[in-house]
Curated annotation (Swiss-Prot):
Keyword match Cytoplasm: yes
Name of the molecule in the record: Protein TusB
SUPFAM superfamilies named among the record's database cross-references: DsrEFH-like (SSF75169)
Subcellular location, record wording: Cytoplasm
Keywords in alphabetical order: Cytoplasm, tRNA processing
GO CC terms of this entry: sulfurtransferase complex
Coiled coil regions in record: none
Amino acid sequence: MLHTLSCSPYHADLDTLLRSLEQGDALVLLQDGVIAALVGGDIIHRLLDSAVLLYALRPDTEARGMTEQISNSVVLIGYNEFVQLTVEHPQQLAW
């Protein structure tokens, strides 16, 4: 399943999101959701413990001036890669 987080992780039900993640799932952080990928934060550690593939939309990190602060464990992707993930994961859940 493809999960997308578009709001700040501080305004999302992160516990429910983490419980719903399963092996083989992917999580794309976009819009204000990219805040979850900041290095050194407790949220990124919780996401990394979930053992799913983590992505952040590069245009959104750039728009917020955060690209250099994104964890190296998060793959920065563009719109084309995002579309490819939607093809690979027909089931999707937006948070």
